Amino acid sequence: MSEMTPREIVHELDAHIIGQKKAKRSVAVALRNRWRRMQLDVDFRQEVTPKNILMIGPTGVGKTEIARRLAKLANAPFIKVEATKFTEVGYVGKEVEQIIRDLTDIAIKLTREQQMGKCRQLAEEHAEERILDALLPKPKNDWESTDTDTGSNTRQIFRKKLREGQLDDKEIDIDVAQPQIGIEIMSPPGMEEMTNQLQSLFKNMGQAPAKRRKMKIKEAFKLLIEEEAAKLVNQEDLKEQAIEMVEQHGIVFLDEIDKICKRGETSGPDVSREGVQRDLLPLVEGCTVTTKHGMVKTDHILFIASGAFQMAKPSDLIPELQGRLPIRVELDALSADDFKRILTEPHASLTEQYVALMGTEGVKVEFTESGIESIAKAAWQVNERTENIGARRLHTVMEKLMEDISYEASDKSGSAFVIDADYVSAHLDNLVQDEDLSRFIL
């Protein structure tokens, strides 16, 4: 679990996302509160529930990007899902409890990696012995055996060469475990336990024996380390730790929640909107979900919901769900100045990406201050005149601007291009000023 302070989290987010201070501060505090809660006494800790967040803002201003970056910082089970992918229980489609099952699978993978990391040194030793056994087979009969000291010395010589990388390209025959065959079974609601038992049965039936393969020692060493580390991991402890991690540190990011708001009066069941909201209620409030790894309680899982709310309002969510998302954060629409900062300030910004890509062809591209200002202004104008899609408009504008250079780069190695205001004007002015062209091309 991340022990970063709110200030450190915001600083990390600033490296990738421009503006949106309120949203960054809210998610930073929420993430830090996960750590603070774990410092409390066990009895008191159970009473402290997470304050779920609702992020409201137009498309392309950074809501989803905040989620992506937060996932890397959290060092905890994190899942991002689209609310529109789910339907009400009893209808064809994914039910919302699948969110927790997927989150548990992520936690299992995360915990396995952590445990395998702890026993990696021992796994390397075991893998080394298996490679030495392949290089120096043990004698089958007593009369084939040589002097014990000589055999031991030879093994040590080969061990030294192996560690120094002198044998990396030598080929050996080793027995490698075959990957297990996974079978996905769709189950009706309430039948998850039976489905899990069937999957376990098929898994055991489909477990293939180890296969002898010829490969280079360098590749074999990596495979054997993974195999030996997997043997050292206790599967029951792994499941217990993973479920504990989900229950105490799990984070669910619900994107596009505005798309499941009920709009106007409709007849018949609304299985992918209001029905989904009702199914989300017990998850957000706290319930127990059956997974193939065990029972998972959702009482202390943090939920962060986000939506553009262009066709609906937060008040269109059912009241019970509104009450379970107490922290509201409004993200600001992006200005021309924000676009300018997006083009230059973030790590691996758009301009840096194009410079690096063209550099692979031996073409030098330089973006001037005036050129960047013109690109930002053009993107902002198109957003104002047509649909406002936020920072995503920059991708379209930049691709159109760089189209000729990208096409001809492979034939112009050693050339240099300066992207200034005049260049931008020559390539984009017609498209920006003509609303019909802007609508269909940019």
Curated annotation (Swiss-Prot):
Q: What intrachain disulfides are recorded? A: none
Sorted alphabetically, which SUPFAM superfamilies does this protein's record hold?
P-loop containing nucleoside triphosphate hydrolases (SSF52540)
Gene Ontology biological process terms, A to Z: protein unfolding; proteolysis involved in protein catabolic process
Q: Where does ATP bind?
A: I18, G60, V61, G62, K63, T64, E65, D255, E320, R392
Query: What Gene Ontology molecular-function terms does this entry list?
Result: ATP binding; ATP hydrolysis activity; peptidase activity; proteasome-activating activity
Read off the Gene3D superfamilies from this record: 1.10.8.60, DNA helicase RuvA subunit, C-terminal domain, P-loop containing nucleotide triphosphate hydrolases
A GO CC term assigned to this protein in UniProt: HslUV protease complex
Q: Which keywords does this Swiss-Prot/TrEMBL entry list? A: ATP-binding, Chaperone, Cytoplasm, Nucleotide-binding, Stress response
Q: Where in the cell is it found?
A: Cytoplasm
Cross-referenced SMART domains: AAA, ClpB_D2-small
Q: Is the keyword ATP-binding assigned to this protein? A: yes
Concerning Pfam families, the annotation shows: AAA, AAA_2
Q: Does the keyword Nucleotide-binding apply?
A: yes
PANTHER family associated with the record: ATP-DEPENDENT CLP PROTEASE ATP-BINDING SUBUNIT CLPX-LIKE, MITOCHONDRIAL-RELATED, ATP-DEPENDENT PROTEASE ATPASE SUBUNIT HSLU
Similarity field: Belongs to the ClpX chaperone family. HslU subfamily.
Assembly, in brief, is: A double ring-shaped homohexamer of HslV is capped on each side by a ring-shaped HslU homohexamer. The assembly of the HslU/HslV complex is dependent on binding of ATP.
**Task of the protein:** ATPase subunit of a proteasome-like degradation complex; this subunit has chaperone activity. The binding of ATP and its subsequent hydrolysis by HslU are essential for unfolding of protein substrates subsequently hydrolyzed by HslV. HslU recognizes the N-terminal part of its protein substrates and unfolds these before they are guided to HslV for hydrolysis.
UniProt protein name = ATP-dependent protease ATPase subunit HslU
Q: Which organism is it from?
A: Shewanella putrefaciens (strain CN-32 / ATCC BAA-453)
* Gene responsible for this protein: hslU
